[in-house]
Amino acid sequence: MSLTLLFDLDDTLLDTNMDAFIPAYFQALSKHLFGRVSPDVMLRALMHGTNLMNESYDPTRTLQEIFESDFYPALGITKQELVEVIDDFYDNIFPTIGGHTRQRPDAAPLIEWALSQGFRIAIATDPLFPRKATWHRVRWA
């Protein structure tokens, strides 16, 4: 049986200047959705949906289900109407805000060493970002 090492992404593998990252994220998403959703409405819906995710203890629903059941109705638009635009944001725009993060200096050598020893690696993070955003954050680390 091989040993699996669990690393937390945030502040273990990746430093994020949240004071710069969150405003850049909100601004980029607002700009990308402009013309479809007003920035004020989008920000309120995003914050409310995120708060619902943080407050949920419902084991029968995923955080994505909780978020989406509130977010899209608050925008007054269906998921189907925005899914391509949001996918485009996370594919092409979100990666540009990675400059507000930096790799932890010892993280990559530690991961490389663990892999060279035959250990399996698992990375944990707070699941507030969509999967595509999380994968970008892992790559930044």
Segments predicted by a language model, with ranges:
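Short, surface-exposed alpha-helical segments at coil->helix boundaries
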Residues: P23, Q27, E65, R131-H136
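Active-site neighborhood of HAD-like aspartate-dependent phosphohydrolases
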Residues: M1-H48
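Substrate-recognition element of Asp-dependent hydrolases with the DxDx(T/V) motif
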Residues: D88-G99, A107-R139
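A generic "structured core" feature
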Residues: L13-D15, H100-T101, W140-A141
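Short, flexible/disordered intra-domain loops and linkers
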Residues: M18-I22, S56-P59, R131-K132
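A metal-dependent, Asp-based hydrolase signature
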Residues: R44-N92
